[in-house]
Amino acid sequence: MAKFEIKDGVAIIPKGTREIPNNAFFGCSSLTTVIIPESVTSIGSGAFSDCSSLTSVVIPESIKRIGSFAFSGCSSLTSVIIPKSVKIIGNNAFDGCSSLTSIVVSEGVESIKGRAFFGCSSLTSIFIPKSVTSIGEAVFGACSSLTSIVVAEGNPIYDSRDNCNAIIETATNTLIKGCSSPTTITIPSSVTSIRQFAFSRCSLLTSVFIPKNVTSIGEAAFSGCDSLTSIVVEDDNPIYDSRDNCNAIIETATNTLIQGCSSPTSFTIPSSVTSIGCGAFSGCYSLTNIVIPESVTSIKGHAFYGCSSLEIVHLPAGVSNFEIDSFKDCPNLKAIYAPKNKVDFYKEHFPADMRQLIVEDGSDLPVKA
């Protein structure tokens, strides 16, 4: 096996090396520059993961595959060019590269695996060449600065019809990734499905209009859209509604609220809603007050995850299905009020560090331990 070392911040990869092994430079915080010789054909999983000082990497045209997590967590990396020789960009390959502003995916790349560029929060634009025929789940999820998405004309699998700033799977009319440009998104009327995380952390997005042809919306499709203040579902949509002008997407048949927003700081859930879906209010950072009606019997995981301004919650008596992480990462919660006969139930279902906040309706504010 070739011997690898770092000299003056530069990775020394001997000429003749065919593969950079898994985790070869994992966590090397002193590494700033990587120049890969043209003998290398594969970059292993986690090869440069968590190299937090890495600012520059040159990927030669000999590389055919970039492994899973190869550059994940390289938070100082600002740009990368994926050459035409690369056929596969692995799962989470550049996950969490928060300083990455420019990505060039060259014509010749065929597959971008799940979460390959997840959390690249400085990325502003994406161009998908016509050679890319496979895009995994949440590839560009949580890319909060994204304002431009273009798919090359002639791509046989994907398109960005009507200049919609989105990636759409042509055959199924599924919108798999969208963005705000700068504050609104127009979903083409031909779209029938929105994939999970499609608009995750589009922090500039202020309003969403769901056309009547959209009959499937994936989990957390709009999670972390912290500027979102208006949600409207078109009349006559057979699956979803936004009843009572409630600024939410509700699954009509099950009365499940799957996405809400803060407008601007408080939200009243309609009294007909019986379930609050996974991640329904996740990342609604400005939300300070939530009114949950007595009709609600189920609160799913991450329902209010990361609602960092939320202070007071009143929970109803009828809840029988409650997941422990429903209010995870709500650091400013002062009180969780519950009916007398449900206090013990909620204390059993909340994490230990939050149980002191749960008090009976009408009680004084609890004192944090």
Residue spans for each PLM region:
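Structural signature of tandem-repeat unit edges
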Residues: 1-19, 29-42, 52-65, 75-88, ...
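Surface-exposed repetitive/solenoidal architectures
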Residues: 24-26, 282, 350-352
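Short glycine-/acidic-enriched loop or helix-start segments at secondary-structure transitions
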Residues: 324, 347-348
